[in-house]
Design a protein with these regions (language model features):
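Hydrophobic transmembrane alpha-helices and their helix-loop junctions in integral membrane proteins
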Residues: 15-61, 67-376
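Single conserved hydrophobic/aromatic residue that forms the stacking wall/gate
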Residues: 1-9, 13
Length: 376
């Protein structure tokens, strides 16, 4: 399928870059062999999830990426914060997984098959109420993985793992799995207007909630984490408006600029002895020019500045929402537009507080700060 090929291509390509980045980032860690083992396992099951041609294979990949994310977030297992974050991520995702399991059982009972081609070809002949229930359960399952409102508590705390893990979880793998399920099940969702309206509302509210929460964050990685939550809201919004191709387009774009933001943030943390509080940074532009450029480019794309990749997909989602002459389409447009403004504000705030303001860190940090070795 188009969704599977696009997701797998962006996922594998981005993981290659993350692996290269991790070679230097994790070079001083005595357990880096275990780290790369987990990373490769995560890649395998994510590709399995998007490459399967039936719901059973999808479910196997879905469950195992949750296990791999637990292992990666809890990589530094002697740190209490990492233990708590990994457990929270695993437990919150179980809530959504339960709904997804029930939806798959419903598909088996209703269609007697789990192959995508068979299920989708029989969908027009099935009861609309049954398809609505399955659609709502698929939505609830996707909400857990994609950190939609109500099940989003695990995403900001998933920062406890190494920065390459944050990049994987927040850009094109774990959080995109929920959106992928909706994209892959789009022929079923089209027979349930109730499910589509619910998806639109959930996505719109999440985009606004996460963007407004991001305004109040001072942790460098948490700001980017809440931007992920907000962008997932845009993807759900697009799916609810039946604009699946646009959602897939933004999913691929988001994968790259969000990975760029996280990996660049990791380079900043590497240079500042893991200082994540933006209020204690500042003045690093002359010392970290490549990191600054990378974060600036990623932020401009996140803000949907014209001629950046994020502009072509994010602006298109808002344009399509505006063209929907229904109440939930108007709500989606206005909440999405306000969220875009808030996103621009906290993205510029991140760049300014980290690189452009007056130096607020100890002198020894500025004396030793330098760009990551990959830039040398």
């Amino acid at each position: 399928s188009t969704q599977g090929v696009s997701s797998a291509a962006s996922d594998v390509y981005k993981r290659q870059l993350v692996h290269l980045y991790s070679i230097d980032y994790m070079s001083s860690d005595p357990h880096n062999q275990r780290f790369f083992c987990y990373l490769s396992l995560f890649t395998f099951f994510m590709v399995l999830l998007v490459a399967g041609d039936n719901y059973f294979v999808l479910f196997v990949g879905w469950e195992f990426i949750a296990v791999c994310s637990y292992l990666l977030i809890n990589f530094w297992f002697t740190v209490i914060e990492a233990n708590k974050s990994a457990m929270q991520s695993f437990i919150v995702n179980r809530v959504g997984d339960m709904a997804l399991s029930i939806s798959f059982l419903g598909i088996v009972c209703l269609f007697g098959n789990v192959d995508f081609s068979t299920v989708f070809s029989l969908a027009p002949m099935m009861n609309e109420s049954a398809l609505t229930i399955i659609g709502l359960l698929l939505l609830f399952g996707g909400m857990g993985k994609s950190a939609q409102i109500g099940l989003n508590t695990w995403l900001p705390t998933a920062m406890a793992g190494p920065t390459p893990v944050s990049s994987l979880i927040h850009s094109a793998t774990l959080v995109s799995a929920g959106v992928y399920v909706l994209l892959r099940s789009s022929p079923l969702l089209e027979y349930s207007s109730t499910a589509l309206i619910a998806i639109t509302w959930i996505g719109s509210i999440t985009a606004f909630f996460a963007a407004s929460t991001g305004l109040l964050q001072n942790d460098l990685k948490r700001v980017i984490a809440y931007s992920t939550c907000s962008q997932m809201g845009y993807l759900f919004l697009a799916c609810g408006l039946s604009q699946y191709n646009t959602a897939l387009f933004h999913l691929v774009n988001h994968a790259f600029f969000k990975a760029l933001l996280f990996l660049s943030a990791g380079a900043v943390l590497h240079a500042t002895f893991d200082q994540q509080d933006q209020r204690r940074l500042g003045g690093f532009l002359p010392l970290l020019p490549f990191s600054y450029t990378s974060i600036l480019v990623g932020s401009l794309s996140l803000m949907a500045v014209p001629f950046m990749t994020g502009f072509y997909s994010k602006d298109l989602i808002l344009e399509l929402a505006c063209s929907q002459y229904v109440f939930h389409g108007s709500i989606a447009y206005w909440l999405g537009s306000i969220s875009a403004g808030l996103t621009a504000f906290y993205s510029f705030r991140l760049v300014a507080m980290t690189f452009l303001t007056y130096p607020n860190s100890p002198k020894k940090i500025y004396e030793s700060a330098h760009d990551a070795a990959i830039f040398a």
